[in-house]
C-alpha cells in the first residue's frame, strides 16, 4: 500500500470512528437539545449562546471576531485581493470553498425531472414545469393536430389562429365559468375577482389552483438541490438563502455567519446609495405628477384612480436621493419668496430646480422633501442598531451624503 493510500485509509477510519461515537456532551442551555460526540464541539456550540468570539481579526481597523478559527481564516482571505478558490467552469475567484460550491451550482442544471426513465434537467424550475406539461402530461398538445408546445400561451395562440373556436383560457376557480382570449386577461380576472390561495408550507399567496400546484413543486425535495447549509447543525439544508437566514434566526438565536450578514445588511444599504447616482430625472417626474393631479383632481372614475395610484407609486419609487445630498440655504421665508406676485418661486433646496407660481404648491413640494428625509433617517437608524464593521463606513457615508444638519425652511 502506498503512503497516500495509507493516509486516506487512516483518515476514513478516523472519520468513521468520530461519526460512530455517542453524543453524550449535551448543551445545558434551556430550550436547547443539541448534543455532540466531542467536548470541543460542545464548547464551540456554547459560544453561540454566550456570543463569545475568541478568534479576532488582527488586520488594522478591523474589529471582526468569530466563534471558530476556521471562520477567522476565511475572513482573513477577504482582506486580500487574491482569491484562492476558482470556478472550474468560468474561472471566477471566491474566498472560501463554501462560496465556490454555491457559485459552481449556478453552472449546473439543478431542477431534474422525476418521471421514470427521463434524465432531463433544467436550470430553472419554470423550464422543468414546461417540460413536464408538454412531454409527460401532454397537456400542452393540440388535440386537433397533435402539435406540442412548451407554454400554455403558445398553445392558446395556435388554437385561435389555426382552429378558431371559443376563447382558450377558462377560469378554474370553483363556480366561475368565464372564458378569456388571452392568458394575461385571465390572470387579471383571477387577481381582481378571486383571493389568492396560500401555500400551507410557507404562506405565499398563489394565483389559482394551478399556481398553487406549480408553487408546491418548489418545496419538493426531489426537484431541488439544497445548496445552502447551516454552519452549526447537519439538519439545516435549504434551497434558498432566505430560508437559511430564517433557520439561523429561529434555531440558532440569530447567530448568522458573517458572510451572510454582510450580504443581507450591507447590500441593502449599498442599493440605497446607488439610487442617488442612477436617478436624475426628479424634476420632470414631479412636474408630470403635479400636472396630472391638477388636471384630474375633480373628476376620476375608479379605474382612473387606480392608474393614478400606480403612477404615483412608481414616481415615489424613482425619486432621487440626490435631492437630499446638499444642505439647505439660509432661512428664506415663504413671504419673501412670494413678495413679487405672479413670479416663479424657486425651491430653496440646493440641487433642486423646481419652480412654483403658488405658495400651496411650494409647501406641498417641501413636505415631500421632509417626508423622504424622515424615511431615510428611519432606515439609517435601523441599520445602526445592528451595525457591522463592514457596514459602518457605509452608514457614516450615507449620513453625510443624505442627511443635512439644517432644518426645513418652511415654518408651519
Swiss-Prot record:
PROSITE patterns in the record:
ZINC_FINGER_C2H2_1, ZINC_FINGER_C2H2_2
List keywords of the entry alphabetically: DNA-binding, Metal-binding, Nucleus, Repeat, Transcription, Transcription regulation, Zinc, Zinc-finger
Q: Low complexity bias located where?
A: 9-20
List every stretch annotated Disordered: 1-20, 285-316
Q: What is its main location?
A: nucleus
Key word Zinc present in the record? yes
One Pfam family it belongs to: zf-C2H2
Stated induction or repression of this protein's expression: Expression is induced by HAP43 and during biofilm formation.
Which GO BP terms sit in this record?
5S class rRNA transcription by RNA polymerase III; regulation of transcription by RNA polymerase II
**Where is there biased composition of kind Acidic residues?**
293-303
* Molecular function terms, GO-annotated: DNA-binding transcription factor activity; RNA polymerase II cis-regulatory region sequence-specific DNA binding; RNA polymerase II sequence-specific DNA-binding transcription factor recruiting activity; RNA polymerase III type 1 promoter sequence-specific DNA binding; zinc ion binding
Q: Where are the zinc fingers (C2H2-type)?
A: 25-49, 55-79, 85-107, 111-136, 140-162, 169-194, 197-219, 228-252, 345-369
| Species | Candida albicans (strain SC5314 / ATCC MYA-2876)
Protein name (Swiss-Prot/TrEMBL): Transcription factor IIIA
Q: Where in the cell is it found?
A: Nucleus
Q: Name one GO cellular component term.
A: nucleus
Question: What job does the chain carry out?
Answer: Transcription factor required for transcription of 5S rRNA by RNA polymerase III.
Question: Would I find Ligase among this entry's keywords?
Answer: no
